[in-house]
Amino acid sequence: MSWDQVWIDVNLATMDPSISAPYGAITNAAIAVKDGKIAWLGPRSELPAFDVLSIPVYRGKGGWITPGLIDAHTHLIFAGNRANEFELRLQGASYEEIARSGGGIISTVKACREADEAELFELGRQRLNALAKEGVTTVEIKSGYGLDTETELKILRVARELGKHHHVDVKTTFLGAHAIPPEYKDNSDGYVDLIINKMLPAVIAENLADAVDVFCENIAFNLEQTERVLSAAKAAGLEIKLHAEQLTNMGGSALAARLGAKSVDHIEYLDEAGVKALSESGTCAVLLPGAFYFLRETQKPPIDLLRQYGVPMVLASDFNPGSSPICSTLLMLNMGCTLFRLTPEEALKGLTLNAAKALGIEDNVGSLVVGKQADFCLWDIATPAQLAYSYGVNPCKDVVKNGKLVHQHT
C-alpha cells in the first residue's frame, strides 16, 4: 500500500456511531493517512502490507487516538479584560446588573474599538495556540465586541487571518446582535436595522462569516428582533445559530428550531417544548459549562430531556472575557461531567462529532472514518474516560492536521 504515514501500537476512539463499542473504540489498532485523508483504519492484525522503509511509521506506545477536538463556540478575539467585574460578582453583583450599568460586553466593546488589527491578531494567536496544544484542530470564532460596522468587520477579518496563518481551521460567526451599543440604548430596533441593512451586507461582501448568531435574552434582543436578524442571514445563505435560554426562557430555542438553526447555545432554562422542537429540527444543543461555573449559576441545562429526545449535545469553551475566561477544552470535558453529569463518552462526543454537526462540517471531520480529513490526536492515556477524569497535566502527545504532524509534545 502507498500511504503518507501509518500509526501503529495505538487504540482508536473513532466516535463513529456505526461502531457499537463505547467511543467507537478499536483496540490494538492502526490508522493510515494519504493525501490529508484517513485512508485505512482497523485492528493492527488486519493492516495491509506496506513498505516500512518508504513510509513514516509512528508508534503510539499504547496510547489513544481521538478525532481532533472542535471548539464550536468561542469569543476568542477581544482586547482588555474584566477582572474588576469578577470582583464585583464575588461581592454580590449579578451578570445582568453589571451589564445594565454599562459593564459587561460594552466594556469589552470599548477596548476592541480602540485596538488595531495587529493587536487583536496577536492576542487571538496566543489563545489559539493554547487551544491547539490541547488537541483542538477546529475552532469557531464569533465577532460581537464591536457593535458597529467597522469594528465588527475588523474582528472578523482578524479571525479569517488567524485561519490562514494557523494550522487550526477557523469557522467565523457574525454576532453583531450580541448587545445593544450605548449609541442605540433607546433605539434597539434601529440597531437591528443597522445590522440587517449595513453590517450584514458588508460582512457578506468580504466573505467574512460562515454563520450568524444572536443573543436572544431580555438584556439583549427580543424574539421579534432575533427572528429579523436570523431570517435575513438565512435569506443570504448563511448558517444560523442562537444564544438562547441562558438567563430566562424566552422561547428562543423553539424559534431557532423553526428557522433551521444549526445550534442553540447555553440553554440552561430550556423547557421540554423547546427540547422537542430541537429534536424535530435536528438542531444541536451547545452546553457551556465554563460560563455556568464562572457565573456561579445554579440552573442546569435539561440533560435528561436532551438525552430522552435524542438532541445532539455539544461541549464548548465559550471562551470570552466576561463569563468564561477559560481557554481550555480539556477543562470543559471535566466540567461537562462533574457539573452537568454527562458521561465521559457524551462529553468527548460533544467536542468531536457533535461539535462538527453544530458547525455543519460533520461530513469532513469529527470522527475517525475512512475518507474524512485526517485530523486526530494521540493522547498518553489508558482509557478515553481519562480525558474527562483528570485535569492539569496535558496528555496530548501528537496532533495530526490535514494529514500533517503539526504538534509533538515532548
Curated annotation (Swiss-Prot):
UniProt keyword annotations, A-Z: Cytoplasm, Histidine metabolism, Hydrolase, Iron, Metal-binding, Zinc
Q: Which domain of life is it from?
A: Bacteria
Indicate where this protein resides in the cell: Cytoplasm
| Amino-acid positions noted as binding Zn(2+) in the UniProt annotation, renumbered to this chain | H73, H75, H243, D318
In this chain, N-formimidoyl-L-glutamate is annotated as bound at Y145, N320, G322
Q: Which residues bind 4-imidazolone-5-propanoate?
A: R82, Y145, H178, Q246, S323
Binding of Fe(3+) occurs at H73, H75, H243, D318
Q: In which pathway does it act?
A: Amino-acid degradation; L-histidine degradation into L-glutamate; N-formimidoyl-L-glutamate from L-histidine: step 3/3
Q: Which GO terms describe its molecular function?
A: imidazolonepropionase activity; iron ion binding; zinc ion binding
* Keyword Metal-binding appears in the UniProt entry: yes
The cofactor named in the record is: Zn(2+); Fe(3+)
Q: Which GO terms describe its cellular component?
A: cytoplasm
UniProt remark on cofactor binding: Binds 1 zinc or iron ion per subunit.
Q: Does the keyword Glycoprotein apply?
A: no
Catalytic reaction annotation: 4-imidazolone-5-propanoate + H2O = N-formimidoyl-L-glutamate
The protein's matches in SUPFAM superfamilies, at most eight in alphabetical order, are given as: Composite domain of metallo-dependent hydrolases, Metallo-dependent hydrolases
- Alphabetized PANTHER family for the sequence: IMIDAZOLONEPROPIONASE, IMIDAZOLONEPROPIONASE-RELATED
Q: What does this protein do?
A: Catalyzes the hydrolytic cleavage of the carbon-nitrogen bond in imidazolone-5-propanoate to yield N-formimidoyl-L-glutamate. It is the third step in the universal histidine degradation pathway.
What family does the database annotate?
Answer: Belongs to the metallo-dependent hydrolases superfamily. HutI family.
Q: Could you tell me what this protein is called?
A: Imidazolonepropionase
The root-end lineage is: Bacteria, Pseudomonadati, Pseudomonadota, Gammaproteobacteria, Alteromonadales
The gene designation is: hutI
